[in-house]
């Protein structure tokens, strides 16, 4: 591997570790890192989805192991999210549109997450509500299409919605978004099959890097991080990634 590929492998390891700790797979971080390295959207999208798929699979397995996945909370978002993500995966945005759109969405999500983390009421344990089916179906479909179009997996957008609507605790949200990421990344990668030939030759090494980082992060997030810290860390990650894509 050349110096740039090694540097990205290290960056991907750190990104996967940090994101997996909060139930995310890191697609927005991978996208930001590759965009800053000069990769085209045609290569960024399938690569980010492949890396996202690896980490979300590890995260899902870890959350299943500790019994934190509630399928009642997952399937309403996935029913329409999966096909919508596959449809979005087949859509290719030009670079001048791709980066600002994704960056803006991430910044808005970060602000909402930060407000939730800093409010005293957000740190008080409350009984979460079960997501209403119709609302979850619409949310899953919209986020699925947007995430498929941008190559971001979707969990990074779904988490703020779940927490804001009190549809789950911080740990339940992390578990739900890990599964949602896995399903939507798979669907979007299938939808983006036309750009598979743009995948970098270094992808296998990057997959190993994110697998290692994701394993460590998922273990930390599922067992050791408090609910308030999960919110704070996720908001910071969202803001940094969004600002990098905007500027």
UniProtKB/Swiss-Prot annotation:
Listed transmembrane segments: 5-25, 31-51, 74-94, 121-141, 202-222, 227-247
Topology class, membrane: Multi-pass membrane protein
Gene Ontology cellular-component terms listed: plasma membrane
Main location per the UniProt record: membrane
Cellular localisation: Cell membrane
Keyword Acyltransferase: no
Keywords of this entry: Cell membrane, Membrane, Plasmid, Transmembrane, Transmembrane helix, Transport
InterPro entries in alphabetical order: TM_pro_TauE-like, TSUP/Inactive_protease-like
Family: Belongs to the 4-toluene sulfonate uptake permease (TSUP) (TC 2.A.102) family.
Entry-linked PANTHER family: MEMBRANE TRANSPORTER PROTEIN MJ0441-RELATED, MEMBRANE TRANSPORTER PROTEIN-RELATED
The protein's name in its UniProt record: Probable membrane transporter protein y4hK
Species of origin: Sinorhizobium fredii (strain NBRC 101917 / NGR234)
Taxonomic lineage of the native organism: Bacteria, Pseudomonadati, Pseudomonadota, Alphaproteobacteria, Hyphomicrobiales
């Amino acid at each position: 591997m050349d110096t740039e590929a090694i540097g990205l492998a290290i960056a991907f390891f750190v990104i996967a570790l940090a994101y997996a700790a909060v139930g995310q797979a890191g697609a927005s971080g991978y996208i930001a890192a590759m965009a800053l390295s000069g990769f085209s959207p045609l290569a960024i999208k399938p690569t980010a989805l492949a890396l996202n798929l690896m980490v979300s699979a590890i995260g899902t397995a870890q959350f299943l192991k500790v019994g934190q996945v509630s399928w009642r909370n997952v399937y309403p978002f996935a029913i329409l999210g999966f096909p919508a993500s596959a449809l979005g995966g087949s859509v290719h945005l030009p670079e001048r549109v791709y980066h600002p759109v994704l960056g803006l969405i991430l910044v808005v999500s970060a602000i909402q997450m930060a407000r939730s983390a800093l409010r005293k009421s957000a740190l008080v344990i409350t009984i979460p509500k079960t997501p209403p089916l119709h609302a979850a179906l619409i949310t899953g479909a919209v986020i699925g299409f947007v995430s498929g179009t941008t190559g971001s997996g979707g969990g990074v957008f779904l988490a703020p919605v779940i927490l804001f609507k009190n549809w789950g605790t911080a740990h339940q949200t992390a578990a739900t978004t890990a599964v949602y990421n896995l399903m939507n990344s798979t669907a979007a990668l299938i939808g983006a099959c036309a750009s598979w030939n743009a995948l970098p030759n270094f992808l296998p090494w990057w997959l190993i890097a994110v697998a290692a980082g994701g394993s460590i992060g998922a273990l930390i997030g599922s067992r050791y991080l408090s609910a308030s810290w999960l919110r704070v860390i996720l908001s910071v990650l969202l803001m940094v990634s969004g600002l990098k894509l905007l500027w």
